A protein has these predicted regions:
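Helix-to-loop junction immediately C-terminal to a conserved catalytic motif
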Residues: 68
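Conserved ABC transporter NBD signature motif
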Residues: 76-86, 91
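Conserved ABC ATPase "signature" region
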Residues: 115, 119, 124-139
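Catalytic Walker B motif of ABC-type/P-loop ATPase nucleotide-binding domains
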Residues: 168-172
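ABC transporter nucleotide-binding domain
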Residues: 184-269
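Short, charged/small-residue-rich alpha-helical element at the C-terminal edge
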Residues: 238-311
């Protein structure tokens, strides 16, 4: 892909505006006694990259379908760009959607597809410029059926960002892309954000969410299990220090769970402090901490903890 040829704006400054781009309040979607979405509330600020994550069946897709105007909620309110999602005339042209499976006509060419979807969006852009942005210029006259999986994803992205919409939904945007194409896509997203676009991301690549998202909503059984910045989410679980001590060593100076063969594990919310205490103690005792490893909590750890927590 090539860089987006657009002006540079401010992006998200971490402060929620008076009128958020997305405002969801007490949202419910029920099928009889089953609640696909239950009492869900959250806001997305202008220029923010907000990641909506969760296990399969957590309610992400249903939530996004309601926000995008494709499904009606049982109860609750949703505001998108200051309007109801059902007010398609006020919202549709200002919103771009990259679906996981686009369903483009296989007989249309790349240029025809971008032109058709772009025209339906009622946004203004140059078709060939957008094709060039996603590095499909050489495929402009190629039919969709003849594209590779990665090329189809780039075409999906092109139709979503055509005309620089204010709000962009990216559903698994890097699936099927090689590393270089992933990097190019994220650079393009960065440029869109600099120009003020708001991004809502769903992905199974947790490292992408951890690196890219301003805030994350973790869904479980139809509602939020946790929500916040990566730092806020990871602070809810302890970091881990692991090491081995020689046989006959005195116990370590900090609470640790002992395993076989002199192996110890420390769970801590003050990683740097406890690690320094442990290292100083080992030095004073003349002991070697074998297999020493320490690491902060990752988003993957938080995600895995969802299944361990009671409902």
């Amino acid at each position: 892909m090539r860089p987006l040829l657009r002006g540079v704006g401010s992006g998200w400054d971490g402060v929620m505006s008076t009128t958020p781009v997305i405002d969801v309040h007490q949202l419910n979607l029920a099928y009889g006694d089953f609640h696909a979405v239950k009492d869900l509330s959250f806001r997305v600020g202008q220029g923010e990259l907000y990641a909506l994550l969760g296990t399969n069946g957590a309610g992400k897709t249903s939530t996004l379908e309601i926000i995008e105007g494709h499904r009606k909620a049982t109860s609750g309110t949703v505001s998108v760009l200051g309007h109801s999602p059902s007010d398609r005339g006020a919202v549709r042209s200002r919103m771009g959607i990259m679906l996981q499976e686009s369903g483009f006509s296989p007989d249309l060419t790349v240029r025809e597809t971008v032109g058709l979807i772009g025209g339906l969006s009622r946004r203004v852009d140059d078709v060939d410029r957008v094709i060039d942005v996603v590095d499909l210029k050489r495929k402009a006259t190629t039919r969709v059926s003849q594209l590779s999986g990665g090329e189809k994803r780039r075409l999906d992205f092109a139709t979503a960002v055509y005309g620089g919409p204010e709000l962009i939904f990216l559903d698994e945007p890097t699936t099927g892309l090689d590393i270089s194409s992933r990097d190019d896509l994220w650079r393009a997203v960065d440029r869109l954000r600099e120009d003020g676009s708001t991004i809502v991301l769903t992905t199974h690549y947790l490292e992408e969410a951890q690196q890219r998202a301003d805030r994350i909503g973790l869904m479980h059984r139809g509602t939020f299990h946790r929500e916040g910045t990566v730092a806020e989410l990871t602070q809810t679980l302890p970091a881990v220090i692991g090491f081995r001590l020689p046989a006959g060593s005195p116990p370590p100076p900090i609470p640790a769970a002992a395993a076989s063969a002199g192996a110890f594990t420390v769970e801590t919310f003050q990683l740097q402090f406890d690690l320094r205490v442990l290292l100083d103690w080992a030095h004073q005792q003349g002991l070697e901490l074998a297999d020493l490893h320490a690491g902060p909590t990752s988003l993957d750890d938080v995600f895995r903890a969802i299944g361990a927590d009671p409902a």
